[in-house]
Amino acid sequence: MKLLQYIFICTLILTANAIQAQSVYLTPGGKEEWLLNRLEIKTRTKQLSFSNFKPLNRKWVVNEVDKLDSLYATKDSTTKGLTELDKYNIQRLLMANSEWSKPKEIYIAEKSLIKGLYVNRANMIDKRNSDFILIANPIFNFQQGSKAGNTQSTFINQRGINVRGIIGNKIGFYFYFTENQERQPTYVQDWRNKFIAVPGAGYIKNFKVGGFDYFDVRGGVSWQVAKFMDMQLAYDRNFIGNGYRSLFLSDFSANNMFIKVNTYFGKFKYQNIFSELVSYRRSGSDRIYPRKYFRASYLSYQPTRWLNIGLFEGVMLGKRDKLSLPLFNPIMYTSF
């Protein structure tokens, strides 16, 4: 872990003069991703075809969706498959990310019940000046379900806060925190009992009968090194691939600490992720959790709107191995 910290500090110092305005990323699994997946399928544009890298950069998303919104207004053939509900969801996305979208009067509330809150209709707190932007929203998610023949109901009880911002027009930051109580369907409970883990969660504890309780904490900083490259240091999850689950890198695991480098050149995108993985299985005594170190590299090429070609490499160092410098070689297939 110390090596990751040293590399981050050295990189930040070396690139300090070149840092440009940088956005943070969309919340993994959020409703914005659902909308983008739909827009990619309905419009089939190359601009939205890099969604096999998640989470997505907010600034990039707003730029592309704003272009699509303009095409919809002119009834361009690209948007003929979109509905009025799609139009509404596009406006909601642009409103929620107004730090990057074009100013519109409909984004500003006529009046708010509490002074200073929901000045922007989509964000509870939206404070900004020439050097600082702060946006914060509460998180409330309550769901309950049932299944025929099962006396136990399923439920999700989630409360928390989501904060993001930009410092000095150069460093983007975000923080996401929720407290969660859940009782999942029987097959998920069986999986949990078998592997002593919950999909997407780290440390967990029992809650009532068949339920579990856990915190979901994420956060990080990001900065743009050059026009064609950005970097991120965060404690979160990543996704490389297509579909709900990926055979390359899925967000099925718990959050982990990582450094990520994205490089863009024409129709190519190259991503490197260097991360530390921690096993949260409890052994009944106080001890250091086992750790592994992992690097994922993915090169994506989008020659047409219907074809994407990718190369993937994953390197894992087991818990008995010491952290090795070749792991940080960003060139695919040359580390070991």
Residue ranges and their predicted role:
Residues 212, 238-239, 246, 250-336:
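Signature for the C-terminal beta-barrel architecture of outer-membrane proteins
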Residues 161-165, 219-223, 233, 259-263, ...:
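Residues on the lipid-exposed face of transmembrane beta-strands in outer-membrane beta-barrel proteins
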Residues 28-41, 94-153, 165, 169-175, ...:
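Transmembrane beta-strand segments of Gram-negative outer membrane beta-barrel proteins
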Residues 128, 167-169, 224-227, 264-267, ...:
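Outer-membrane beta-barrel strand-turn architecture
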Residues 119-120, 137-139, 156-160, 214-218, ...:
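Transmembrane beta-barrel architecture of outer-membrane proteins
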Residues 1-24:
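Bacterial Sec-dependent N-terminal signal peptides
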Residues 26, 51, 147-151, 206-209, ...:
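Outer-membrane beta-barrel domain signature
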